[in-house]
A protein has these predicted regions:
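Non-catalytic, solvent-exposed segments at the cell envelope interface
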Residues: 2-12, 16-219
């Protein structure tokens, strides 16, 4: 599922770039018409700069933004996926981080406490979550993308839904934890809207693999 979300995110970036690009092109045309009278164009060779080093992006899903969670609490990063893009091998590798891993979290005041990995975001936002993961795994994270539950719903709806394959053999729902939520995802290939995609990515208690199964659905 994260692959679809990455695609959505890149799509939003592309739309923004195209909009800015169209405006910039208009200004460029006006400028070149004026400058053409004052200088002579010289030959230039266009060079394409290609990335050579891997790029690591942290995707974080934060458990805020739901209709039942409107308090000012920052939330936990209950979903964390490392995405590494390697231009040399031309491969993209995705790895989920277990949210319940016990680790050392250095607090903003300099003290250190042992807590679950997902609590780092609640303690100090994206900056502390990133630094905690970097220290724990001895890696460097270049960029991050953070989305809450409402953000996920809006992204999915904005692209007209996403198609998933429910291979669990039974409908997916979270009504046992949230009785008001009556959404159920049928077995097999399904096209989901934002509300349904949120349920699909959150359910874990009914999954035989628990949180590991949920991580697979998120990826």
């Amino acid at each position: 599922m994260a692959k679809k979300i990455i695609g959505m995110f890149l799509g939003f970036v592309l739309v923004t770039v195209l909009g800015v690009g169209a405006y910039a092109y208009t200004i460029y045309q006006q400028s070149t018409q004026t400058l053409a009278k004052t200088y002579k164009q010289i030959g230039e060779e266009t060079k394409v700069i290609e990335a050579t080093e891997p790029l690591t992006i942290l995707l974080m899903g934060v458990d805020t933004g739901n209709v039942e969670r409107t308090d000012p609490w920052a939330g936990n990063s209950d979903s964390m996926i490392l995405v590494t893009v390697n231009p040399k091998t031309k491969k993209v590798v995705m790895m989920s981080l277990e949210r319940d891993i016990l680790t050392q979290i250095q607090q903003p005041d300099g003290s250190v406490r042992e807590a679950k990995l997902n609590a780092a975001y609640a303690d100090g936002g994206a900056e502390l979550a990133i630094s905690t993961i970097q220290k724990m795994m001895n890696i460097h994270i270049d960029r991050y993308v953070m989305v809450n539950m409402h953000g996920l719903q809006r992204m999915v709806d904005a692209v007209g839904g996403i198609t998933v394959n429910n291979t669990l053999g039974f409908p997916i729902s979270i009504q046992d934890q949230e009785p008001f939520n009556t959404i159920s995802i049928g077995v097999g290939e399904q096209t989901l809207n934002g509300d349904e995609a949120l349920v699909y990515s959150r359910m874990r208690y009914q999954d035989p693999e628990g949180d590991y199964g949920r991580q697979k659905r998120q990826r």
